[in-house]
Regions:
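Accessory alpha-helical/coil subdomains and C-terminal extensions
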Residues: 108-189
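Short beta-strand segments
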Residues: 29-31, 55-58, 99-103, 166, ...
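Internal gly/pro-rich beta-alpha loop/helix module
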Residues: 56-137
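ATP/NTP phosphate-donor binding region
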Residues: 1-19
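Short, charged beta->alpha transition segments
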Residues: 16-17, 39-45, 174-179
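Short acidic, glycine-rich surface-loop motifs adjacent to enzyme active sites
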Residues: 24-36, 183-191
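Short Gly/Thr/Asp-enriched flexible loops that form oxyanion-binding sites at enzyme active sites
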Residues: 29-52
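Short coil/turn connectors at secondary-structure junctions
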Residues: 22-26, 49-53, 93-97, 102-103, ...
Length: 191
């Protein structure tokens, strides 16, 4: 269950990945589906220019269940993390960013969200194309994959004083004001 994920845990995970960056070619993070997209997004901003794959994956059904999606998701995530770029003169990893692999689709970590609690395509990226699709072969969209534009960094200054306000037709100024008058609130994303 990933419902207890927090800003502090994202910091722990980001530090762990950053300090082991030079020891491994890529990383696979097994994660619960409820907060996987939030974690992927946080890691993508905490670890800019990481330069190596960080692939988050998980399953809708527990690994011990006969019809689990977890085995295929894990094996494919490992394959994605271990795929080298044959066209790169430095022969580095093909994927060099935080991604989610789930339900036969490779998604940018900060462009995804969970939309379905029951289906095997539970995580989606509706506003950005898939970075890759998986069938018999893994087909990457090389033109969409990010490349580092500088040194890898660890940015730990996350602020939990942020909220999202969903604007709806007919919302009164008082209702909006009430949502923005939270003690300790430092920023709001208006949708």
């Amino acid at each position: 269950d990933s419902s207890d994920m927090s800003v502090e845990r994202w910091g722990e995970l980001a530090r762990l990945l950053f300090h082991r960056r030079d020891r491994y070619d890529g990383f696979v993070v097994l994660h619960g589906t409820d907060t996987m997209a939030y974690s992927a997004s946080a890691l993508s901003f905490m670890l800019p220019n990481f330069g190596k794959p960080i692939v988050l994956t998980g399953s809708q059904l527990p690994i011990g269940v006969v019809r689990t999606d977890g085995k295929e998701n894990l094996l494919t995530a490992i394959e994605i993390a271990g795929t080298w770029d044959s066209s790169d003169p430095q022969r580095g990893p093909l994927v060099r960013e935080v991604v989610i692999y789930f339900g036969d689709e490779l998604m940018r970590g900060n462009r995804s969200h969970k939309q379905d609690a029951e289906g095997f395509q539970a995580l989606v990226s509706p506003n950005f194309p898939a970075l890759g699709e998986v069938g018999v072969h893994v087909r990457f969209r090389r033109d969409l994959l990010l490349r580092p534009r500088g040194e890898a960094r660890l940015l730990e200054a996350l602020d939990s004083g942020v909220t999202v306000v969903h604007l709806i037709p007919g919302m009164t100024p008082e209702a909006l004001s009430h949502q923005l008058c939270i003690p300790g609130l430092r920023a709001a994303v208006l949708r």
